[in-house]
Curated annotation (Swiss-Prot):
It is found in: Cell projection, Cilium. One of its GO terms (biological process) is cilium organization. Disruption phenotype: Knockout cells show deficiencies in cell multiplication and ciliary functions. Mutants move with greatly reduced velocities, have disturbed waveform of beating cilia and have stiffer cilia. Mutant cilia lacjk an arch-like density of the radial spoke 3 base. The lineage of its organism: Eukaryota, Sar, Alveolata, Ciliophora, Intramacronucleata. Gene3D superfamilies: EF-hand (1.10.238.10), YVTN repeat-like/Quinoprotein amine dehydrogenase (2.130.10.10). The keyword Repeat applies. This is Cilia- and flagella-associated protein 251. Residues 971-996 are annotated as: Disordered. The keyword Repeat applies.
Amino acid sequence: MYQQEEYEVNNEGQEDVSKINALNLKWTLGFNFQLTDGVHNLTNEKRKEIFYPVAHTGVIYDYENNTQRLLQGHCNRITATAYCKFSDIIVTADCGPDSMLVVWDASTGIPKKTIFEPHPNGCQALDISQDGQFIVTLSKEANTDTDVQSLSLWEWNKDDEPCLITNEFDRRIKDYQYFVRFNSDDNTEFATTGKTRIVFWRREGEQKGFNYYSPGNIPSLKVLTQTVFIPDNTQVVTGTTDGHIIVWDISLIIEKVDTPKERRAIKLVDLMNKSKKPDGKKGSNSINILKIQDNYLVIGSSNGSIRFYDFQYRIIAWFEDAIIGSISNISFANTPMIEDNEDEDGFDDERKDKGENEPKFICPDFIVVDLDATITMLNYKLFEELDDEKKKGTTLMKSIVSPIIAMSCRPNSNVIGICCENGYLYEWNFQEKSSVLSILRVFDTDKENIPNCIDYSPDGNWLSVATKSGKIHIFDCKEKQWQNSVLEVSENEQGKPKVNMQVFSSDSKNLATMDADYAVSLFTIDHRQFDVNIPEKEWQFVGKHRIHHSEIKSIAFGESKNENDKKYYRLFSIGADMKMVEYEVLEIDYSKQKEKGQQINYIDRLKLKSIYPIEQETIPTACIWYPINMYKEDVLLTVNEEFKIKLWQFMKDNFKFCKKTCLGPIYGGAINKLLILNQNDAQNDYQDKYLAYSTKEKVVGIIKLPLEGNPNQTMGLIAHPDKITSISCSNDGKHFFSSGSDDYCVNVWSVNVQALEQIFATNPNEDPYPKLLEGGEDGQTHQDLKNFFYYSQIRSKDEHTTKARKLDGKVPLIAIPDMMRSMGYYPTNKEIENMQNEIRFSKYLDPGEQVEELDLNMFLKLFVNHRPVQGIGKSKIAESLNTLTKSLSDSAKEIAEQAKGQSVQPKTYNIDGIGEISLQDLKKILTTEGERMTNEEFDECLKILCGENEDQIPQQINVNNLCEDILGFEDLEGEERDDNIEDQYEDEENEEYDQD
């Protein structure tokens, strides 16, 4: 147990710029196709580029040269973007903690302005004025039903305070606003749109607020989408989900004196429910997108139609032959349009002959983005094109359309595999960087055959796809065909457990899986039907064990050598039950098949070897076979939820112990995935190596091996804004890959080994460990640590003697527990054993001796690496106490049911609903379970904590008296109170609201 006030965990995942240079983002696959108005056409006379957001990164993509410029800086997913053609600037914003609003130079990709926390929770939507001077932002609220939105106007290029006005919405509006748009003729006016209401805003002079009003005469049952201002006109148009537009105009009726002119709905026009051409697209016709391009109102619909109308709402042109899904954006190039005098086919002459005096339809090239993750380029001439194939336009990008489940890089190639929730399995060449993915297979999601993890074998010959229904599909990468027989981890037809992880052995001949039923299974490639006379080989099931009684967190193969120096494989699993299970992988000698009377068990090749508890208070999260093997050791590396990395040594006599415990990276949460970064050098026992890791969300990083407990030998950065599903790397370690989930993104990173070494290089004259203490090297904690160590030296030399003592700067290992407790860290007996073994066997395998003493530096390393990162607080004690009371309650009910045949609910909660336990029950638990105390030790501790007076000892123990009266903890965890209680309005849905 360890109570600590000031030691904090850095969950930001942010490192120095030099550390980020060690992992450079080189390419990002995918884009946020669901973000309305998120993609912009940057094409002009000098460039052919588009901008789109990917997770928390902006991308300027040159579709002519297939290159990317990456705009990095956001730590949350980008939720709003805008582009100003006049100023050639891009605006991006995100929502979440540490949100930002960034203005980028579109020609260079360099940020021109960064505004931190434009709103407390970031931006829902934004727009930029026609001249690029002003930005308007809508806040994103955590609870869209109860929280009040705000709207801000920014003059972003001001050197001082850029925010001009911030205004909260009137609670009576009762409609969350999703969209905002400037009036292109007047940058003091803009409109916001929700599902049922539109609000018009105007800034008057330099006053500190807005005039706004929300018209109430919206046609019933209309769900609104977007709003645009008609140029050189007072009319405004709002789209609806049923294919209509609502036309707003200045009201001619003055309702009361001094009421400003306000827009009212003057008509409802059906634009999309009737096709304007015989073979037009049918189906749902929601108006998703409204744009103004020159003299046209442009509409993009949910059925993939693009239509151009004049400002009398008469159709001029339509594009309905391209294979386009529900549209999320339309964006036009910034190129001057010069109408040809005559087409190649003489079309203009034909128009004149027919007496058509209307100007010919013309517009810049434009891109269309749909919800099928496709970006299509269209040209205005396609409207009059007769060839159906040519009318489909040019596909610039066809990307990932479903959340990513898993990703893996194929060794000895430039291909990565990606599987998604919709059952699609893709392959993508990261050297060619194609904008269109290659589909390897589509799994039938109706049969719950959705892939859950994919992995290539180390030799690159096999691809294993494990599904949520317990099936394993094997793909032969050389022959380009799937194995006919499908492997299964369970024969029970009623419930097929989901395969959560799979791993190949280093020789690519064994495949191990762990599933949701807490079982570990083994498959191997062997002769069909295990008949040596059949030359064909296939993957087959050869063993299974269900040892864990809780979720398995990770599995790993290890390599060892027997007495004959022959290599064999062992398999390890770690689980939420805090246990490590070791299995031996048996090999079959087919020469015995011919021996008379010899019976061979071809199936049972996974032999249970040992079960060992590796944690007491925290859950292990990942494991990997330790690749550093200078002394021919067998070592497994594990990590846990408390940010600790442990090395477990396996001796020849099946003896195992914790060789070392190190503080791991503490940014971004606990590590849940590990891999060797430079796998080509994995067999080199002496070369420095690197472990790549990922946390459950946001952070990936690198750990330098061998582990020394040096905090300078780890780095991490924000790779994704949310969940990370997979990490992988190329065999040479030069490319590292990470995949998100519903950000539809795979990031390709280049690894700079030289930069890594510069990062991890430690000044020999600088001790990094004191910096991990509160106050650093000159702080009180470091001084206390030295004082307690020196006092331990005196005690070890007999503190009561009057003779001169000769201190040699070392203390015996038996002094470790008292020194740790004096520093406020109360280790368990097992933790004490681990610390003593770490010192005792630190030199054992080199000269063959055991170390029985430690110096000050050793003690400092032990303390910073073993103590809990987060101290024990009242909430954690309450959680533990509730666990005990629940356990007692369940036990009492079970006893009562057995004795009387009925359930009895024992009293384990007081009148305030706080879990409590009697003093006698607490004593029984502490003296009979876990690391047991004796009765005398319990009584002695209670007297020390509560005093000699037995009346001061409470007979019922709850979290309050245990923490405050017995343990003397300070209440460091303040409770949050919401004192901001505002009145609620209950107004009619169509009531109008004004503010002057």
